[in-house]
């Protein structure tokens, strides 16, 4: 009786049942684009008599209220289906309804039509079924259910309790026979209201008796929407999600097949792959070329740097990530194009050809999510870079980024740890930026009595700030086109001359020099001049606006921004009113802000510096960081008043 009672409680909600009260969602999550009213899923492993094999059946049912036009996309669904050789996943039982509340109080129902169900080929191993509910508008409720069947027991669907819209009720049931063992992991910050485990009848019978099974029920209620904010890695690192990994499978009284791997197995599998390990041994392609790239009297560092720059110049990144090569090193060199693996495995081969010990580091990019560090698997990884060690200093190199300095990984790669896979072993290496993202502004000029400011503005960039600016410049057809765009988009002041230095050398600071004329920089107030002492670089928006943040702030690198302003005042002018000088820091000195205004021999000197001395802030540090930026914004909105001295 206990089993029956529990099973009845853990059940799907009725399809097609709707009431007028369901449309009244004004007070629930008032700022949401849409609301999941109910959501139910079940993953069940069954024995299929016709095929004589176990299959994984996944049932999904949801009901969503569309609050406004921004939520209309939630009436469109994409269901991925995996295929391999003759085996493939299938979908059936697709049924959908759109409900609209009419003015007379009646509820209109529009059934999903077959023409709104399309299957597209995504790749050789994956299709996508796209479902679009019809006649959806603001205030609609949509309902959808379907079932997928998979012969791939390792592909048990993850259950995403949290999404970008709130959910009132989300329920998932897994029903797994004892012959299958899964590692189950709940990640994110969603608290489950119910989690209980019960025995259930698998209906799988062997010559030795029935196979027992375990039913686990997971329920969460009133789940808030996940809110994306600046400075974070992939949201899927932090959304409340239930994941399953097949650990082992066994035939009753037969052998057990283990699916959980080891890092040694992962290394051996990669080194044995034609599009990975084979491409690491392409040293012969570079033996004849290297004498034109490096010289015998070079230091190992200089040789590595020269080879790094050579590969960057020979193979252009095609904007595709890859743990495995698309074209292979030889073809990438011939076509002068390739994905990240084509480029970086070529780099490793070239370094090895120069007798520099180079090995691959596999990693997961920031947008791909955090890999499971204690679960050896290839599927979590989508990228490879090169590792070398010179004079006891380790360097990670990515030659796919044409504007990255030697040893500084692109921001996309800064995602906690990567795995260094040598032929003799493996180890974890930190993925971190060696350089602070730095921008410095320096202005020297003269203020006229009519409020016009004229002078020279220098901006100097390093780290990711320089990389981003170089990418922006090279996205234009020419340097002159870039300058023209800057000229057109600069509305506060006129640029009379614009020079750029060190554009082609990422190892140097990128410098831009502009001769500017800023009319109405200062407002005339009686005989005084009143102005905010910023030409550019002013902080106007706080990147942190949540009341609390459950996931870390990840900046990618330390940040540094400074501004030095030297303005010669009109004759006999002096400071009459100015903001107070500021020297503030967080308690652990992880962030600091200086704002100093002074006058010397008729020249106004403004010095501003903001430093963020670590790349990651934990959730309990969030409010302090938010307040820190609020003080910066407040200080940079205050005026300085200068006028003729009364002496």
Segments from the language model and where they lie:
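Bacterial N-terminal signal peptides
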Residues: 1-4
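Sec/Tat signal peptide C-region and signal peptidase I cleavage site
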Residues: 6-10
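A sensor for short, sequence-defined functional sites
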Residues: 11-647
């Amino acid at each position: 009786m206990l089993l029956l009672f529990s099973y009845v409680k853990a059940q799907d909600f009725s399809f097609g049942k709707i009431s007028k009260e369901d449309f009244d969602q004004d007070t629930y999550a008032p700022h949401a684009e849409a609301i999941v009213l109910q959501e139910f899923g079940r993953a069940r492993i069954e024995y299929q008599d016709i095929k004589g094999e176990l299959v994984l059946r996944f049932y999904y049912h949801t009901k969503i209220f569309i609050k406004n036009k921004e939520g209309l996309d939630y009436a469109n669904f994409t269901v991925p289906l995996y295929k391999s050789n003759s085996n493939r996943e299938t979908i059936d039982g697709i049924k959908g309804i759109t409900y609209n509340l009419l003015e007379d109080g009646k509820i209109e129902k529009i059934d999903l039509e077959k023409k709104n169900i399309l299957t597209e080929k995504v790749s050789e191993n994956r299709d996508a079924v796209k479902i679009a509910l019809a006649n959806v508008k603001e205030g609609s409720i949509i309902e959808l259910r379907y079932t997928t069947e998979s012969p791939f027991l390792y592909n048990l669907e993850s259950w995403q309790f949290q999404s970008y819209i709130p959910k009132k009720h989300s329920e998932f049931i897994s029903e797994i026979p004892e012959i299958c063992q899964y590692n189950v992991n709940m990640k994110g910050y969603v608290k489950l209201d119910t989690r209980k485990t019960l025995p259930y009848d698998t209906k799988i019978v062997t010559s030795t008796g029935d196979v027992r099974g375990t039913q686990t029920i997971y329920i969460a209620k009133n789940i808030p929407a996940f809110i994306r904010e600046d400075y974070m890695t992939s949201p899927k690192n932090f959304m409340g999600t239930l994941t399953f990994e097949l650990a082992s499978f066994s035939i009753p009284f037969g052998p057990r097949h283990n699916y959980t791997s080891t890092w040694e197995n992962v290394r051996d599998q990669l080194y044995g792959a034609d599009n990975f390990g084979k491409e690491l041994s392409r040293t012969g392609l570079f033996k004849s070329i290297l004498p034109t790239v490096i010289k015998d009297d070079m230091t190992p560092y200089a040789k590595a740097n020269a080879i790094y720059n050579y590969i960057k110049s020979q193979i252009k990144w095609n904007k595709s990530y890859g743990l495995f090569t698309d074209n292979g090193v030889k073809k990438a060199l011939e076509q002068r194009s390739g994905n990240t693996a084509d480029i970086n495995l070529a780099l490793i081969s070239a370094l090895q050809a120069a007798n520099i010990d180079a090995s691959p580091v596999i990693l997961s990019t920031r947008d791909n999510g955090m890999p499971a560090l204690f679960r050896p698997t290839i599927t979590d990884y989508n990228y490879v870079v090169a590792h070398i060690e010179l004079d006891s200093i380790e360097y990670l190199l990515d030659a796919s980024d044409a504007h990255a300095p030697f040893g500084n990984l692109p921001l996309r790669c800064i995602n906690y740890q990567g795995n260094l896979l040598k032929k003799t072993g493996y180890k974890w290496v930190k993925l971190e930026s060696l350089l602070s993202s730095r921008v410095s502004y320096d202005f020297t000029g003269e203020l006229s009595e009519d409020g016009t400011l004229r002078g020279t503005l220098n901006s100097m960039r390093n780290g990711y700030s320089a990389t981003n600016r170089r990418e922006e410049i090279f996205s234009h057809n020419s340097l002159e086109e870039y300058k023209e765009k800057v000229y057109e988009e600069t509305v506060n002041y006129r640029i009379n001359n614009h020079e750029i230095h060190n554009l082609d050398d990422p190892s140097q600071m990128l410098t831009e020099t502009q001769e500017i004329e800023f009319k109405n920089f200062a407002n005339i107030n009686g005989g005084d001049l009143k102005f905010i002492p910023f030409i550019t670089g002013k902080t106007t928006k706080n990147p942190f606006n949540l009341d609390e943040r459950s996931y870390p702030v990840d900046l990618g690198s330390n940040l540094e921004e400074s501004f030095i302003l030297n303005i010669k005042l009109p004759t006999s002018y002096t400071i009459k009113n100015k903001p107070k000088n500021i020297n503030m820091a967080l308690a652990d000195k992880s962030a600091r802000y200086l704002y100093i205004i002074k006058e010397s021999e008729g020249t106004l000197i403004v010095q501003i510096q903001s430093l963020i001395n670590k790349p990651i802030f934990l959730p309990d540090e969030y409010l302090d960081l938010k307040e820190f930026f609020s003080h910066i914004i407040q200080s940079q909105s205050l005026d300085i008043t200068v006028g003729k001295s009364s002496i």
